[in-house]
């Protein structure tokens, strides 16, 4: 009321278009949601202004510095650049009736989704996931897997998960697929899971124990703001007790960043959400390096798209052959592990007379150039062709 804020306009661009959107619109006040890596990226582009309003900083001081090991504030030289307005974890949603109908085991961990048991119905997919270029939350899940299992094994697990499922155009579409029973499982950010449990009985959110992380979802002031005082007043309200009540709405189901909101009359009506809050707090997360994730952000996204989504049919064909031979007893455990790793290990290809491998270091070396689009079409073509050749070679070697 003090700043006469009577209306808000929201823009929700694809995550890879945030930079272009901020530049094109020119007078956006606030960046909100999307995860820490995206916000740290905005900081590196010089788009984020420090939050310096004393009243707002006083409310920020009421927010814990971390939750479950995850930072809830980002400072640079003592200046606050973003503060979390909500908490997220990352796991998957299970449609229990479909799981039972299809005779699939109940998954608890990421590697369960990459198991041959989830490939028994191929080419029918059992898992929904989004292309990382279309979803920051699913991008985070792929980054979690890579950091939990290491670069090479992480990609091998992601490959099998991708083969067991199918790529969707976004996280909402993947969510709809598990809710409708089109698939048995969808990877997801937590609040999709909590909302699904309320709206679609029979669905359940699973947080993989010691295999995930907690994120603080940021809100920040942009340098393009033409109303910085009003913008900071909005930030102040969002992280206040009253503002945090919006997450309690059963149509929203987000995890508040303030525990004291659960002590309000509205909060006492959500013992289910408070139980999830405490379960998330108690879950042992993995050590996660935001800077590492940021250093391979574009490389990871575009590699995934080219290798697992663009040539998905061939990936499924190769994995299905491995699964069938293994489950039919035509392949030993040792042979299965060999072929399962061969399917998804980082690709190698010839470039300028040299053999190049998609190592972590190589991904970091081309990341910025991919982000600007400079090398994008070149490597998308190289990766698609190399992936297609690998899958075809596996099919031929296994007599497919």
Set out the residue ranges of the language-model regions:
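Early extracytoplasmic/lumenal segment of secretory-pathway proteins
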Residues: 1-40, 175
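Ligand-binding pocket segment of bilobal, Venus flytrap-like solute-binding proteins
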Residues: 12-15, 20, 144-206
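A structural signal for short loop-to-beta-strand junctions that line the ligand-binding cleft
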Residues: 18-32, 36, 48-96
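Ligand-binding "clamshell"
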Residues: 42-51, 78, 196-208
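Periplasmic-binding protein-like
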Residues: 61, 65-66, 157-161, 199-223
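A bilobed periplasmic-binding-protein/Venus flytrap-type ligand-binding module shared by bacterial periplasmic
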Residues: 93-98, 214-228, 246-247
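Mature extracytoplasmic/periplasmic domains
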Residues: 222-291
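C-terminal non-catalytic accessory extensions
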Residues: 322-400
